[in-house]
A protein has these predicted regions:
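A short SAM/SAH-binding and catalytic strip from SAM-dependent methyltransferases
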Residues: 106-120
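Conserved class I S-adenosyl-L-methionine
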Residues: 39-48
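Conserved SAM-binding motif I beta-strand of class I
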Residues: 63-68
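Conserved SAM-binding loop of SAM-dependent methyltransferases across substrates and taxa
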Residues: 51-61
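Conserved short alpha-helix immediately C-terminal to the canonical SAM/SAH-binding motif I
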Residues: 72-73
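C-terminal substrate-binding/active-site "lid" region of AdoMet-derived donor-dependent transferases
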Residues: 117-130
């Protein structure tokens, strides 16, 4: 499947981010094969709209958890999981990675999770947001 086809499940307002910020489908498929060859828990840091988690849940028996600080993206990811019928193998958390217990996961994925934060400048990137 091509990115443009997959991205149709997301709102038009978010699709413009795909080429720059979201994991391409071919990369996601390779990452899924490497991270979750068996039933395990995978954490996607800076999950955005959940593209990796959605692809992972659709193609493995693993549990995929995405953490994202943008509440709108978390809601979009949850709706996409429902649409794809993978909500039972995905969880999308609105929050900061510093509040996550990393010891409960078997694998981790970070694809460009800090690009948007760093674009605002170092001082703003270090400011804790609730």
């Amino acid at each position: 499947m091509q990115d443009a086809t997959f991205d149709q499940i997301f709102p038009t307002s978010q699709r413009c981010r795909s080429y720059l910020h979201w994991t391409p489908v071919d990369v996601a498929m390779r990452a899924v094969a490497l991270l979750a060859p068996t039933r395990c828990r995978v954490l996607d840091v800076g999950a955005g709209v959940g593209k990796l988690c959605l692809i992972g849940a659709a193609n493995t028996g693993a549990t995929w958890v995405g953490v994202e600080r943008d509440a709108e993206m978390v809601e979009i990811a949850r709706r996409a999981a429902d649409c794809m019928h993978v909500e039972h193998r995905t969880q999308f958390l609105h929050g900061d990675i510093r509040s996550i217990d990393w010891s409960t996961f078997d694998a981790f994925y970070l694809f460009n999770p800090f690009a948007e934060i760093l674009a605002y400048g170092p001082a703003d990137a270090l400011t804790r947001r609730e």
